[in-house]
Amino acid sequence: MKFSTIFGATTVMTAVSAAAVSSVMTTKTITATNGNNVYTKVVTDTADPIISYSTTRTVVVSNSDATYTKVVTEGPDTTSEKSTTKTLTLTNGSGSSTNLYTKTVTQAVESSTSSSSSSSSSSSSASSSGAAPAAFQGASVGALALGLISYLL
C-alpha cells in the first residue's frame, strides 16, 4: 500500500535532556491517506531524549566483493516552548560513491496546563555521486528510507 501523505501529531508532556534520560510518555497520532481511505494509528511510548550535541555512529558491512560504510549522524536537536526539532542524517557510501539523506521533523510540545495545536513537518533530500553498483544503491535507498520512517515514527 502506498501512502500519499503521512502526518504526525505528537504530544510531549515533558522535555527530556540528554544528560538525564528518564521514562517520559508521549502519544503520537499518525494519520495516513491512500486515495479516499484515511488510516489513523495512536501510539503511546516513551519519548525520545533531546540530543543537545551531534553524535555519529558508523556501521561497516563487508562481503567478498566490497565493503560498504553507513554513517548515521543525529542531533543536535533544538527545543523551544512550543516545538522540538529533530534532525537525522544518513550517509551511505561505497568507495567514491556517497548518498546523503537528511530528514528534519518538528514536533509540537504541550505542557499539562496549556493546549496548543500539534503539527509535524519534514523535509528530505537525497544526492549521489560516483558509480556504486545499481543493486546496492537501490537496496540502500529503500533500507535507509524505511529506517528513517521507522526511527522518526
UniProtKB/Swiss-Prot annotation:
Signal peptide segment: 1-18
Low complexity composition bias: residue spans: 85-98
Lipid sites, type GPI-anchor amidated glycine: G130
Family matches, as Pfam families: FIT1_2 (PF17357)
UniProt source species: Saccharomyces cerevisiae (strain ATCC 204508 / S288c) (Baker's yeast)
Cysteine-cysteine disulfides: none
Propeptide positions: 131-153
GO cellular component: a single term: side of membrane
Superkingdom: Eukaryota
Location relative to the cell: Secreted, Cell wall; Membrane
The name this protein goes by in its record: Facilitator of iron transport 2
Gene Ontology BP annotations: siderophore transport
Post-translational changes noted in the entry: The GPI-anchor is attached to the protein in the endoplasmic reticulum and serves to target the protein to the cell surface. There, the glucosamine-inositol phospholipid moiety is cleaved off and the GPI-modified mannoprotein is covalently attached via its lipidless GPI glycan remnant to the 1,6-beta-glucan of the outer cell wall layer.
Region of interest (Disordered), residue spans: 73-98
